[in-house]
């Protein structure tokens, strides 16, 4: 899975950071220390870590991922990463 989306809401200085969905690579999620959860009202699972986005981006860079783009959607910040 060469593409990865991560996001955070409201403040980027603190976590949590969403790092994947139920179809994400379980090995990568384990390396990031991510927990799987299902928020009340949603019919899907997501992986999250309590780290702020900067820490997550540093960890992903060490694993060969590079940021392709970043955007803000309302109060949500989203990064798209790719691994060669």
From Swiss-Prot:
Pfam families: GFRP. It is found in: Nucleus; Nucleus membrane; Cytoplasm, Cytosol. It comes from the Eukaryota. Disulfide bonds: none annotated. One of its GO terms (biological process) is negative regulation of biosynthetic process. Liver and kidney. Somewhat lower level in testis, heart, brain and lung. The keyword Cytoplasm applies. GO terms for cellular component: cytoplasm; cytosol; dendrite; intracellular protein-containing complex; melanosome; nuclear membrane; nucleus; protein-containing complex. Keywords: Cytoplasm, Membrane, Nucleus. One of its GO terms (molecular function) is GTP cyclohydrolase binding. Mediates tetrahydrobiopterin inhibition of GTP cyclohydrolase 1. This inhibition is reversed by L-phenylalanine. PANTHER family: GTP CYCLOHYDROLASE 1 FEEDBACK REGULATORY PROTEIN. Homopentamer. Forms a complex with GCH1 where a GCH1 homodecamer is sandwiched by two GFRP homopentamers. Interacts with GCH1. Belongs to the GFRP family. This is GTP cyclohydrolase 1 feedback regulatory protein. It comes from Rattus norvegicus.
